[in-house]
Amino acid sequence: MWAWGWAAAALLWLQTAGAGARQELKKSRQLFARVDSPNITTSNREGFPGSVKPPEASGPELSDAHMTWLNFVRRPDDGSSRKRCRGRDKKSRGLSGLPGPPGPPGPPGPPGSPGVGVTPEALLQEFQEILKEATELRFSGLPDTLLPQEPSQRLVVEAFYCRLKGPVLVDKKTLVELQGFQAPTTQGAFLRGSGLSLSLGRFTAPVSAIFQFSASLHVDHSELQGRGRLRTRDMVRVLICIESLCHRHTSLEAVSGLESNSRVFTVQVQGLLHLQSGQYVSVFVDNSSGAVLTIQNTSSFSGMLLGT
Protein backbone atom coordinates (compact mmCIF):
# COMPACT_ATOMS: atom_id res chain seq x y z
CA MET A 1 0.00 0.00 0.00
CA TRP A 2 2.73 2.37 1.01
CA ALA A 3 4.71 1.41 -2.08
CA TRP A 4 1.97 2.32 -4.43
CA GLY A 5 1.64 5.75 -2.81
CA TRP A 6 5.35 6.51 -3.25
CA ALA A 7 5.21 5.45 -6.89
CA ALA A 8 2.29 7.73 -7.67
CA ALA A 9 4.03 10.70 -6.07
CA ALA A 10 7.20 10.09 -8.09
CA LEU A 11 5.27 9.87 -11.34
CA LEU A 12 3.48 13.13 -10.58
CA TRP A 13 6.82 14.91 -9.90
CA LEU A 14 8.31 13.70 -13.15
CA GLN A 15 5.37 15.02 -15.12
CA THR A 16 5.60 18.39 -13.43
CA ALA A 17 9.36 18.65 -14.08
CA GLY A 18 8.93 17.64 -17.71
CA ALA A 19 6.34 20.32 -18.29
CA GLY A 20 8.67 22.97 -16.82
CA ALA A 21 11.50 21.77 -18.98
CA ARG A 22 9.34 21.92 -22.09
CA GLN A 23 8.39 25.53 -21.23
CA GLU A 24 12.06 26.53 -20.81
CA LEU A 25 12.94 24.87 -24.10
CA LYS A 26 10.12 26.74 -25.82
CA LYS A 27 11.32 30.08 -24.46
CA SER A 28 14.87 29.38 -25.65
CA ARG A 29 13.64 28.56 -29.14
CA GLN A 30 11.65 31.80 -29.28
CA LEU A 31 14.74 33.81 -28.24
CA PHE A 32 16.94 32.29 -30.95
CA ALA A 33 14.18 32.82 -33.45
CA ARG A 34 14.11 36.53 -32.62
CA VAL A 35 17.87 36.74 -33.02
CA ASP A 36 17.67 35.15 -36.46
CA SER A 37 14.82 37.47 -37.54
CA PRO A 38 15.34 40.12 -40.34
CA ASN A 39 15.25 42.95 -37.75
CA ILE A 40 18.81 42.02 -36.76
CA THR A 41 21.35 43.62 -39.25
CA THR A 42 25.03 43.19 -39.59
CA SER A 43 27.08 46.43 -39.83
CA ASN A 44 29.87 45.28 -42.12
CA ARG A 45 29.96 48.69 -43.72
CA GLU A 46 30.72 50.40 -40.36
CA GLY A 47 33.77 48.29 -39.71
CA PHE A 48 32.23 45.91 -37.12
CA PRO A 49 31.84 42.51 -38.90
CA GLY A 50 29.71 40.00 -37.07
CA SER A 51 28.18 42.53 -34.68
CA VAL A 52 24.46 42.26 -34.19
CA LYS A 53 21.89 44.93 -33.87
CA PRO A 54 19.80 44.82 -30.74
CA PRO A 55 16.13 44.24 -31.34
CA GLU A 56 14.06 47.28 -32.13
CA ALA A 57 10.86 47.96 -30.28
CA SER A 58 7.95 49.81 -31.76
CA GLY A 59 6.66 51.06 -28.50
CA PRO A 60 7.91 53.24 -25.71
CA GLU A 61 10.48 50.56 -24.82
CA LEU A 62 13.02 52.17 -27.19
CA SER A 63 14.86 54.88 -25.20
CA ASP A 64 16.97 57.82 -26.34
CA ALA A 65 19.97 56.44 -24.47
CA HIS A 66 19.84 53.26 -26.55
CA MET A 67 19.76 55.18 -29.83
CA THR A 68 22.61 57.43 -28.68
CA TRP A 69 24.76 54.39 -27.93
CA LEU A 70 24.03 52.90 -31.35
CA ASN A 71 24.98 56.16 -33.09
CA PHE A 72 28.22 56.33 -31.10
CA VAL A 73 29.12 52.76 -32.07
CA ARG A 74 28.34 53.34 -35.76
CA ARG A 75 30.24 56.69 -36.06
CA PRO A 76 33.19 56.77 -38.52
CA ASP A 77 36.60 56.61 -36.81
CA ASP A 78 38.68 59.30 -38.64
CA GLY A 79 41.18 59.96 -35.83
CA SER A 80 40.30 63.67 -35.46
CA SER A 81 38.87 63.17 -32.00
CA ARG A 82 42.08 61.59 -30.80
CA LYS A 83 44.08 64.51 -32.25
CA ARG A 84 41.87 67.02 -30.46
CA CYS A 85 42.28 65.11 -27.23
CA ARG A 86 46.02 64.97 -27.63
CA GLY A 87 46.10 68.74 -28.26
CA ARG A 88 44.06 69.41 -25.15
CA ASP A 89 46.31 67.12 -23.15
CA LYS A 90 49.42 68.95 -24.30
CA LYS A 91 47.90 72.34 -23.56
CA SER A 92 46.72 71.31 -20.16
CA ARG A 93 50.05 69.75 -19.36
CA GLY A 94 51.85 73.00 -20.31
CA LEU A 95 49.71 75.11 -17.95
CA SER A 96 49.29 72.74 -15.07
CA GLY A 97 52.60 73.04 -13.22
CA LEU A 98 54.78 75.90 -11.90
CA PRO A 99 58.16 76.64 -13.57
CA GLY A 100 61.02 74.79 -12.01
CA PRO A 101 64.12 76.34 -10.45
CA PRO A 102 66.93 77.60 -12.73
CA GLY A 103 69.54 75.12 -13.71
CA PRO A 104 73.15 75.20 -12.54
CA PRO A 105 75.56 77.66 -14.23
CA GLY A 106 77.45 76.43 -17.20
CA PRO A 107 81.19 75.99 -17.40
CA PRO A 108 83.39 79.11 -17.82
CA GLY A 109 84.23 80.21 -21.31
CA PRO A 110 87.67 80.19 -22.83
CA PRO A 111 90.13 82.90 -21.69
CA GLY A 112 90.30 86.04 -23.77
CA SER A 113 93.22 87.26 -25.76
CA PRO A 114 95.98 89.02 -23.77
CA GLY A 115 95.72 92.80 -23.52
CA VAL A 116 98.18 95.30 -24.88
CA GLY A 117 101.12 95.85 -22.54
CA VAL A 118 101.31 99.36 -21.06
CA THR A 119 104.77 100.66 -20.32
CA PRO A 120 105.58 103.30 -17.68
CA GLU A 121 106.65 105.64 -20.48
CA ALA A 122 103.20 105.40 -22.08
CA LEU A 123 101.50 106.10 -18.75
CA LEU A 124 103.72 109.14 -18.16
CA GLN A 125 103.00 110.51 -21.63
CA GLU A 126 99.25 110.07 -21.13
CA PHE A 127 99.44 111.83 -17.74
CA GLN A 128 101.30 114.76 -19.30
CA GLU A 129 98.64 115.12 -21.99
CA ILE A 130 95.86 115.10 -19.37
CA LEU A 131 97.71 117.74 -17.33
CA LYS A 132 98.21 119.90 -20.40
CA GLU A 133 94.52 119.74 -21.30
CA ALA A 134 93.51 120.63 -17.74
CA THR A 135 95.88 123.62 -17.71
CA GLU A 136 94.57 124.91 -21.03
CA LEU A 137 91.00 124.55 -19.79
CA ARG A 138 91.88 126.45 -16.60
CA PHE A 139 93.22 129.42 -18.53
CA SER A 140 90.45 129.43 -21.10
CA GLY A 141 88.50 131.97 -18.98
CA LEU A 142 91.10 134.72 -19.40
CA PRO A 143 90.45 137.55 -21.89
CA ASP A 144 91.70 136.94 -25.40
CA THR A 145 93.93 140.03 -25.21
CA LEU A 146 95.90 138.37 -22.42
CA LEU A 147 96.27 135.03 -24.20
CA PRO A 148 98.66 135.10 -27.16
CA GLN A 149 97.95 132.65 -29.94
CA GLU A 150 101.33 130.93 -29.57
CA PRO A 151 100.97 127.85 -27.31
CA SER A 152 104.39 128.47 -25.74
CA GLN A 153 103.24 131.83 -24.30
CA ARG A 154 99.75 130.88 -23.10
CA LEU A 155 100.77 129.67 -19.64
CA VAL A 156 102.42 132.93 -18.50
CA VAL A 157 100.60 136.07 -19.61
CA GLU A 158 101.61 138.37 -16.73
CA ALA A 159 105.07 138.14 -15.16
CA PHE A 160 107.80 140.52 -14.07
CA TYR A 161 111.18 140.76 -12.38
CA CYS A 162 112.60 144.12 -11.24
CA ARG A 163 115.22 145.62 -8.93
CA LEU A 164 115.63 148.84 -6.97
CA LYS A 165 117.33 151.67 -8.80
CA GLY A 166 119.27 152.70 -5.71
CA PRO A 167 119.46 152.11 -1.94
CA VAL A 168 116.43 152.99 0.19
CA LEU A 169 116.78 154.25 3.79
CA VAL A 170 114.23 153.04 6.32
CA ASP A 171 114.13 155.14 9.46
CA LYS A 172 113.71 153.59 12.88
CA LYS A 173 110.21 152.63 14.00
CA THR A 174 108.73 153.26 10.53
CA LEU A 175 106.84 151.32 7.83
CA VAL A 176 108.04 152.21 4.30
CA GLU A 177 106.68 151.21 0.87
CA LEU A 178 109.52 150.48 -1.56
CA GLN A 179 109.39 152.46 -4.81
CA GLY A 180 111.71 153.29 -7.69
CA PHE A 181 112.32 149.94 -9.41
CA GLN A 182 113.85 149.23 -12.80
CA ALA A 183 113.76 146.35 -15.25
CA PRO A 184 117.25 144.84 -15.53
CA THR A 185 118.71 144.65 -18.99
CA THR A 186 120.81 141.61 -18.24
CA GLN A 187 119.94 138.24 -19.73
CA GLY A 188 117.36 136.28 -17.74
CA ALA A 189 115.27 139.25 -16.58
CA PHE A 190 111.73 139.57 -17.95
CA LEU A 191 108.78 141.94 -17.95
CA ARG A 192 105.60 140.55 -19.52
CA GLY A 193 102.27 142.29 -19.47
CA SER A 194 101.31 145.82 -18.46
CA GLY A 195 100.38 145.37 -14.81
CA LEU A 196 103.66 146.59 -13.26
CA SER A 197 104.42 150.23 -12.46
CA LEU A 198 108.20 150.46 -11.97
CA SER A 199 108.16 153.98 -10.55
CA LEU A 200 105.53 153.18 -7.92
CA GLY A 201 106.72 149.63 -7.31
CA ARG A 202 103.13 148.36 -7.64
CA PHE A 203 101.67 145.52 -9.68
CA THR A 204 97.99 145.87 -10.64
CA ALA A 205 96.04 142.71 -11.46
CA PRO A 206 94.53 142.88 -14.99
CA VAL A 207 92.02 140.11 -14.11
CA SER A 208 90.77 138.39 -10.99
CA ALA A 209 93.20 135.54 -10.53
CA ILE A 210 95.80 133.88 -8.30
CA PHE A 211 99.31 135.32 -8.43
CA GLN A 212 102.66 134.30 -7.02
CA PHE A 213 104.91 137.03 -5.59
CA SER A 214 108.41 137.07 -4.19
CA ALA A 215 110.65 139.74 -2.63
CA SER A 216 114.29 139.39 -1.70
CA LEU A 217 115.73 142.35 0.28
CA HIS A 218 119.34 142.83 1.28
CA VAL A 219 119.42 144.79 4.56
CA ASP A 220 122.45 146.76 5.75
CA HIS A 221 122.40 147.31 9.53
CA SER A 222 125.98 148.53 10.04
CA GLU A 223 124.77 151.60 11.94
CA LEU A 224 122.98 149.42 14.46
CA GLN A 225 126.03 147.21 14.99
CA GLY A 226 128.13 150.22 16.05
CA ARG A 227 125.76 150.94 18.94
CA GLY A 228 126.82 147.92 20.93
CA ARG A 229 124.41 145.38 22.39
CA LEU A 230 121.19 144.70 20.44
CA ARG A 231 117.77 144.55 22.06
CA THR A 232 115.41 141.58 21.70
CA ARG A 233 112.77 143.73 20.04
CA ASP A 234 115.16 144.90 17.31
CA MET A 235 113.86 143.20 14.17
CA VAL A 236 112.76 143.88 10.61
CA ARG A 237 109.64 142.73 8.77
CA VAL A 238 109.18 142.51 5.01
CA LEU A 239 105.58 142.39 3.71
CA ILE A 240 103.80 142.16 0.36
CA CYS A 241 100.43 143.84 0.94
CA ILE A 242 97.21 144.33 -1.05
CA GLU A 243 96.11 147.94 -1.60
CA SER A 244 98.72 149.08 1.02
CA LEU A 245 96.43 147.65 3.73
CA CYS A 246 98.72 145.13 5.37
CA HIS A 247 96.53 144.62 8.44
CA ARG A 248 93.13 144.57 6.68
CA HIS A 249 93.88 142.23 3.78
CA THR A 250 95.87 139.04 3.62
CA SER A 251 99.57 139.77 3.21
CA LEU A 252 102.79 137.82 2.75
CA GLU A 253 105.21 138.40 5.61
CA ALA A 254 108.74 137.47 6.73
CA VAL A 255 110.36 138.48 10.05
CA SER A 256 114.07 138.49 10.81
CA GLY A 257 116.09 139.45 13.88
CA LEU A 258 119.14 141.67 13.76
CA GLU A 259 121.53 139.36 15.60
CA SER A 260 123.55 138.59 12.47
CA ASN A 261 127.30 139.10 12.79
CA SER A 262 127.57 140.20 9.18
CA ARG A 263 126.92 143.76 8.12
CA VAL A 264 124.34 142.76 5.45
CA PHE A 265 121.72 140.02 5.68
CA THR A 266 118.87 138.98 3.40
CA VAL A 267 115.16 138.74 4.16
CA GLN A 268 113.01 136.79 1.70
CA VAL A 269 109.22 136.53 1.46
CA GLN A 270 107.12 134.69 -1.12
CA GLY A 271 103.69 133.17 -1.51
CA LEU A 272 100.35 133.23 -3.34
CA LEU A 273 97.66 135.89 -3.26
CA HIS A 274 94.26 136.12 -4.93
CA LEU A 275 93.68 139.57 -6.41
CA GLN A 276 90.51 141.04 -7.79
CA SER A 277 90.73 142.85 -11.08
CA GLY A 278 92.19 146.33 -10.45
CA GLN A 279 93.79 145.57 -7.07
CA TYR A 280 97.52 146.15 -6.65
CA VAL A 281 100.30 144.79 -4.44
CA SER A 282 103.57 146.35 -3.27
CA VAL A 283 106.51 145.66 -0.91
CA PHE A 284 106.74 147.19 2.58
CA VAL A 285 109.57 147.23 5.13
CA ASP A 286 108.77 147.60 8.84
CA ASN A 287 111.82 148.67 10.87
CA SER A 288 111.16 148.12 14.58
CA SER A 289 114.77 148.69 15.62
CA GLY A 290 116.25 151.84 17.08
CA ALA A 291 118.50 152.63 14.09
CA VAL A 292 118.22 153.39 10.39
CA LEU A 293 118.32 150.43 8.01
CA THR A 294 119.44 150.52 4.38
CA ILE A 295 117.81 148.39 1.67
CA GLN A 296 120.43 147.85 -0.99
CA ASN A 297 119.75 148.34 -4.70
CA THR A 298 120.35 144.66 -5.45
CA SER A 299 117.03 143.84 -3.77
CA SER A 300 114.40 142.41 -6.14
CA PHE A 301 110.63 142.06 -6.52
CA SER A 302 108.97 139.52 -8.86
CA GLY A 303 105.60 138.00 -9.59
CA MET A 304 103.55 136.01 -12.11
CA LEU A 305 99.96 135.04 -12.86
CA LEU A 306 99.18 131.40 -12.04
CA GLY A 307 95.53 131.05 -12.96
CA THR A 308 91.97 132.12 -12.38
UniProtKB/Swiss-Prot annotation:
One of its GO terms (molecular function) is hormone activity. Glycans are attached at residue 39. Processed into Adipolin fC1QTNF12 and Adipolin gC1QTNF12 by FURIN. Insulin enhances endogenous C1QTNF12 cleavage. Residues 82-93 have a biased composition (Basic residues). InterPro entries: Adipolin/Erythroferrone-rel (IPR052136), C1q_dom (IPR001073), Tumour_necrosis_fac-like_dom (IPR008983). Residues 1-21 form the signal peptide. Residues 153-308 form the C1q domain. The record marks 287, 297 as: Not glycosylated. Residues 99-113 have a biased composition (Pro residues). Widely expressed, with high expression in subcutaneous and epididymal white adipose tissues and brown adipose tissue. Expressed in adipocytes (at protein level). Residues 36-119 are annotated as: Disordered. Changing residue 93 to A: Enhances protein processing. One of its GO terms (cellular component) is extracellular space. The record marks 91-92 as: Cleavage. One of its GO terms (biological process) is phosphatidylinositol 3-kinase/protein kinase B signal transduction. PROSITE patterns: C1Q. Keywords: Disulfide bond, Glycoprotein, Hormone, Secreted, Signal. Homomultimer; disulfide-linked. Adipolin fC1QTNF12: homotrimer; disulfide-linked. Adipolin gC1QTNF12: homodimer; disulfide-linked. May interact with ERFE. PANTHER family: ADIPOLIN. Belongs to the adipolin/erythroferrone family. Insulin-sensitizing adipocyte-secreted protein (adipokine) that regulates glucose metabolism in liver and adipose tissue. Promotes glucose uptake in adipocytes and suppresses de novo glucose production in hepatocytes via the PI3K-Akt signaling pathway. Administration lead to reduction of blood glucose. Able to attenuate inflammation in fat tissue. This is Adipolin.
